[in-house]
Amino acid sequence: GRVTMAGEDITGLPPHELFHKGLLRTFQIAHEFHSMTVRENLMMVPGAQSGETLWNAWFHRGRIASEEQDLRRKADEVLEFLTIAHLADEKAGNLSGGQKKLLELGRTMMVDARIVFLDEVGAGVNRTLLMTIADAILRLNRERGYTFVVIEHDMDFIDKLCDPVICMAEGRVLAEGTLAEIKANEQVIEAYLGTGLKNKGAVA
């Protein structure tokens, strides 16, 4: 098969090219630079900065300082948007699981992503932080035009975010529709609950 994005065939493109096209992903287990601060983690994302070359490091220090100031300002705006500005100077390794998920979401904001794949964003996250993450995702979608593809098992989280919903099992699509339609689908019930449990529920 082929994968297209805005009409362009992106099948087989390497990760760095997908990144530059605005296609990003987060991971079920968050990956961060443990010993760096939350703000520094965000400032690392854009890449291709002037300070990366020895020539600029010696002869264009003013440009480097200006770029760093701009990145710092943008990182602080992202942290404010995500309601974790108070953690800017905290070591990323000290964050909770949910806070690390917010940090990963913040990374996508540093490069103005177009499409973001979220892999099991609710895994290991308490309910309060999960709803904070959901609110941030909704705002990014509605206010900034981000598109999210959410891979998730938490039905409350899906209900808050997703329309339509696609249910898959063993690599194939079982059903597509609203969450209510998915929950009522016979194939979905059988695949995830089993025929025995389905029949038991019907008798009860």
Task: Name each model-derived stretch.
Residues 131-143:
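Helical segment within the ABC ATPase nucleotide-binding domain
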Residues 158-160:
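A short, surface-exposed alpha-helical micro-motif characterized by mixed small hydrophobic
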Residues 52-87, 114, 135-138:
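Conserved ABC ATPase "signature" region
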Residues 116-119:
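Catalytic Walker B motif of ABC-type/P-loop ATPase nucleotide-binding domains
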Residues 91-95:
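Conserved ABC ATPase signature
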Residues 1-8, 20-21:
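Conserved ABC transporter NBD signature motif
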